[in-house]
Amino acid sequence: MRVVRLLRLRAALTLLGEVPRRPASRGVPGSRRTQKGSGARWEKEKHEDGVKWRQLEHKGPYFAPPYEPLPDGVRFFYEGKPVRLSVAAEEVATFYGRMLGHEYTTKEVFRKNFFNDWRKEMAVEEREVIKSLDKCDFTEIHRYFVDKAAARKVLSREEKQKLKEEAEKLQREFGYCILDGHQEKIGNFKIEPPGLFRGRGDHPKMGMLKRRIMPEDVVINCSRDSKIPEPPAGHQWKEVRSDNTVTWLAAWTESVQNSIKYIMLNPCSKLKGETAWQKFETARRLRGFVDEIRSQYRADWKSREMKTRQRAVALYFIDKLALRAGNEKEDGEAADTVGCCSLRVEHVQLHPEADGCQHVVEFDFLGKDCIRYYNRVPVEKPVYKNLQLFMESKGPRDNLFDRLTTTSLNKHLQELMDGLTAKVFRTYNASITLQEQLRALTRAEDSIAAKILSYNRANRVVAILCNHQRATPSTFEKSMQNLQTKIQAKKEQVAEARAELRRARAEHKAQGDGKSRSVLEKKRRLLEKLQEQLAQLSVQATDKEENKQVALGTSKLNYLDPRISIAWCKRFRVPVEKIYSKTQRERFAWALAMAGEDFEF
DNA sequence: GTGCAGACTTGGAAAAATGTTC
DNA sequence: GAACATTTTTCCAAGTCTGCAC
């Protein structure tokens, strides 16, 4: 079902993609064209190459509170008998216990990894006893956490207020830093608490123990002359360094994948805002190059070199289908997912004819986060022929583009345009699509609600292009039904109001006095109001249905140049709060400061 | 080229906050 | 003002891409 829906929406998208593109109007960061008001905060500050700051001062990260042992009444059972666990073993048991209702705990890999790591935390005697997860009973632990969550929900107003104030205090104390003389918000000032690793899809490491991070694991980054953050009492930092070519404040190595995690600034900070702005400027710059790049890769489909042909076909997919680059992954370390360059023969099927089109390529693979990408696309004949060639005498597990890597692809792109990489195409195509869609869908005479539907639809076209999917919300059916009930009720009200208006009209005709006239006017206004409400409700229903399995957030936050949306709001008199929430407006402060209603991507 | 570490962006799910209805 | 629905924010996993060593 989902696949069919996406396919249909994609077909519509392809059609709209045929609309001729308007010539680029190029704006340079800081140029008059793109700016309105001073935007001074967003003038690029002159740091030499690679330097991110002159001054960085902060309080260090906030650590998860120490483990609180379970109360005596909450027991763990093994083979039906209560077993008292050591604190270390109990803590890890609670990580599993609190997840009992979750699907993860039904997965064999998760269970196996958890049990394996749990046993490492046990004392020798515990290990002697606890030998099989199937004989473990965590239900009391689970219930304890469920009750605890429920108790939090029913706290009194005062108690809730107190908790809120405590959180705010924490935010004030650890949530900000000073960067080059300005106070900036930190994105994630809390060190990740210990728990069980929740890898997505068929992740081979799911269920493994994510160790508790101690100050001794943490590297602090701050300026030499600043007040060095105090480690928690009785502890010390792994290292304190002063590296102003990076933006992170603190870092540690996570125990499951052995990768580095960072404390970084919030997206509303100047530093993050500037990089986002730069990213969109690079994508805008691509507008001026894209025609030539397209003609070049088309020419390269006929190259004598296999490597060049593969690169040209891959680039075509990246451009046309907004596929990700697809870096190589170590097998066994993560779920088996692919992007463009790592596609295997088994991920594509060639159809000489399908859906009434010639040369159809069927893609079916798991992309980032194990989200399935399924698409059937008619391609140009040389692409089709090349794919046949690339697949010749290969097994299903072989790489489709065996002569291509993301590094070589990006090296090539860099030669075509300064700063160009595979991902820029995603940004470029997402933003240009939003702009085109808004132009095609918005009508100036529409109501605000209808304009917002148009905006969401434009946003949705982009999300579908980028394959941003979500699980259907669990409450979807029910809430849809509620909405339908509401619509039905409103329809009845409208019918009733219409009848009343008819009666009032007759009454006025008969009486012809001022009183009946004012009644008539009142009835007319009522009908209008109800009709408007009905229209709004049905718009809501349409939007909801179309959005069932599409996630709009990622494209909105990462791929769509906010200046396009802001300009649209200004042009069509839609309050920007209808499009961006408070945090989103803070994140896009740079764009709000500079985009006028005539901004063009 | 290839492998790896590091730094940063992008991603959906889950939790929390807020709004609506009875 | 409780119960439920919806929206917003937080969380942290999973990508991209660069630079360096060999």
UniProtKB/Swiss-Prot annotation:
CDD domains in UniProt? Topo_IB_C (cd00659), Topoisomer_IB_N_htopoI_like (cd03488)
> Which EC class, in a word?
isomerase
Q: Where is the transit peptide?
A: 1-50
Q: Where is this region: Interaction with DNA?
A: 261-262, 324-329, 421-423
Q: Which cofactors, if any, are listed as required?
A: Ca(2+); Mg(2+)
Region (Disordered) residue ranges read 22-48
Source organism, top-level taxon: Eukaryota
- Site described as Interaction with DNA, positions? R152, R200, W248, K279, T337, K368, N410, H468, K486
Just give the chief location class. Answer: mitochondrion
Ranges for domain Topo IB-type catalytic come to 268-601
MF terms (GO), sorted A to Z: DNA binding; DNA topoisomerase type I (single strand cut, ATP-independent) activity
Q: Where in the cell is it found?
A: Mitochondrion
Query: What does the entry give for GO biological process?
Result: DNA replication; DNA topological change
Cofactor comment text: Divalent metal ions (calcium or magnesium).
Q: Which reaction does it catalyse?
A: ATP-independent breakage of single-stranded DNA, followed by passage and rejoining
List all disulphide bridges recorded for this chain: none
Q: Is the keyword Mitochondrion assigned to this protein?
A: yes
GO cellular component assignments: chromosome; mitochondrial nucleoid; nucleus
InterPro entries, per database record: DNA_brk_join_enz (IPR011010), DNA_topo_DNA_db_N_dom1 (IPR013034), DNA_topo_DNA_db_N_dom2 (IPR013030), TopoI (IPR001631), TopoI_C_dom (IPR025834), TopoI_cat_a-hlx-sub_euk (IPR014711), TopoI_cat_a/b-sub_euk (IPR014727), TopoI_cat_euk (IPR013500)
Q: Alphabetically list the UniProt keywords.
A: DNA-binding, Isomerase, Mitochondrion, Topoisomerase, Transit peptide
Q: Which residues form the active site?
A: Y559
Family indicated by similarity: Belongs to the type IB topoisomerase family.
UniProt function note = Releases the supercoiling and torsional tension of DNA introduced during duplication of mitochondrial DNA by transiently cleaving and rejoining one strand of the DNA duplex. Introduces a single-strand break via transesterification at a target site in duplex DNA. The scissile phosphodiester is attacked by the catalytic tyrosine of the enzyme, resulting in the formation of a DNA-(3'-phosphotyrosyl)-enzyme intermediate and the expulsion of a 5'-OH DNA strand. The free DNA strand then rotates around the intact phosphodiester bond on the opposing strand, thus removing DNA supercoils.
Q: What is this protein called?
A: DNA topoisomerase I, mitochondrial
